[in-house]
Amino acid sequence: MNTIFTIILTITILVLSLILKDLLFEGRIKKINKLIPGPSTIPVFGNLLQINAKDFPKSVNDFYERYGKVFRLRLGSVEIVVLTGPEVIDECFNKKHREIFKERYIKFSRFFGKDYNIISSNGDYHYVLRGILTSEITTRKLNNGRLESNKFILEMFSNLCKDNKETLVKNTPNQIRILAVKLILNFTLGIEENDETILIIVEKIKCIFEAAGLLIYSDYLPFLFPLDIKSMSKNDIISSYFFLKDFIGIKLDAIKIKYEKENELKNETTDETSSKLNNIPIIENYYKNYLDGSIHYDSILFSISDIIFAAVDSTSNGFSLLIGQLINKPEIQDKIYEEIMRNDENNNTNNISFADHTKYPYIISVMNESYRYNSSVPITEPNKTTEDVEVNGYKIAKGTMIIKNLRGTHLSKEFWGEDALEFKPERFKNQPLYQKGLFHFGAGPRGCPGGRFTESLTFTFLVIMLKNFKIVNPTDIPIDVEGEVGLAMQCKPFDALFIKHTNRNDFSKINKGLNQQCFTSSSQFPTCYQTEFFEFGFNGNFQLNDGIDCSSGVQQLSFFEKGFVFRVDHFLFEF
């Protein structure tokens, strides 16, 4: 009884002390930032109790709609300024104030990786860790097959669909996660794991990202840490993290043994070895830098963990949300398919690489719109100011936590017009990747180092998938493409019907039946052949028109690499 009384008394005294400190003492940051608009605060908690713990990004975006592009929050003891909008974010992170905003604000929950991993390190050491990764995902290396993405993508569809014309894929997002894990493990660790291990890793990563996206109160009031620990333990987030860290540790031990037994990567100088050097897994590059004394041993484990967590979850959810959009808007699928067929001169699209992406402007516009509409991370890891700075007419104090509101930046009508909440690739027509106004990979020196990696995977995945399949909703209920809050937005489960496109070589049977034949009306065109033509991407765009004035002349239609002649007074098919 005395113990309980002592605990209650201690907590009461602590809270009263914090209240008095809050009311009577005004620190430098608070004094400067108080002129920035924002919601009123209460002692100790600030605005913490006004935040929806299960949807922090929505709460932040609601405040933006009330207080504007630059506003102030105080969560517990932490002074925060939230920035929204392409111009403001671009000015702060890419242009005028780039150097002032480049440091990471290390939240309480991130201290275990402080100065050891890519996400939570600062200064020169951060750029060493970051540079090891970015040196392996240059555009040249991606174009030259640094990723074996085609192999894994084709393997997934082969296993799922086999020889069936139509295949119902249950819980499609989970199948995409499995694909992402296989890709990323091969890229980072150079391994291909068994299906049982892959499924365990999928669940562990999903668990971490779902739970870590919720509000962690001790990030703002450290004395609440025991409550957060209890919550994290309940959600298995801690055990999941250490499972993956131990898994990576086992692979690292194997690399250590390999390097102790032989020094072939240093001694061999043949062209064959040079090729191997260009394709060794990321973890070996980190280990080589450890041997050189450039990084700590623990940085290998922490950095590889960062890469696997971030790449698997954000990439897989981005893929799944995009598939959902394409199912809801089949006309976009049709346009993509037509573009693929126009470029597929040698029926070789399954071997496509990111080097070909400039030939596919419509696919690039779809990718840009997907990055806008379905930002993987609606609020990125926070930065902090390294000196006082004025933004949009407001002075922000040195040491302030800075949050980028990407949900508002990408979806607000203020920046994108009345159709901001519509998935509309045409808004990026004939524009390259990395469009102004898009910050899906963050911004500035602390932007996501794996952006080009993700773009390469997304492009390859889209082309291979839609070259081979039309994806259909098996129900009348539209796919939910809003996602659920996590550290990255989580795509809700849905089923999808994958229908194989007819192989273009099957045109031989159409050729045999129709070559050099004329038809004066659509009624004379054999139904069996109509079906084949519709499967080749014409779905509603190709019609046999009766009763058209013969004086209209002749129109030429592009039909793959073959000539397709359309006459208004009759139909002549030339292959």
From Swiss-Prot:
Keyword Mitochondrion (UniProt): no
Predominant subcellular localization, coarse grouping: membrane
Annotated GO MF terms: heme binding; iron ion binding; monooxygenase activity; oxidoreductase activity, acting on paired donors, with incorporation or reduction of molecular oxygen
Species name: Dictyostelium discoideum (Social amoeba)
Keyword list, A-Z: Heme, Iron, Membrane, Metal-binding, Monooxygenase, Oxidoreductase, Transmembrane, Transmembrane helix
Protein name: Probable cytochrome P450 514A1
Membrane topology, from the record: Single-pass membrane protein
The keyword Oxidoreductase is annotated on this UniProt entry: yes
Cofactor: heme
InterPro entries: Cyt_P450 (IPR001128), Cyt_P450_CS (IPR017972), Cyt_P450_E_grp-I (IPR002401), Cyt_P450_sf (IPR036396)
Disulphide-bridged cysteine pairs: none
Residues that hold heme according to the record: 448
GO cellular component, one term: membrane
Protein family (similarity comment): Belongs to the cytochrome P450 family.
PROSITE patterns attached to this UniProt entry: CYTOCHROME_P450
Subcellular location: Membrane
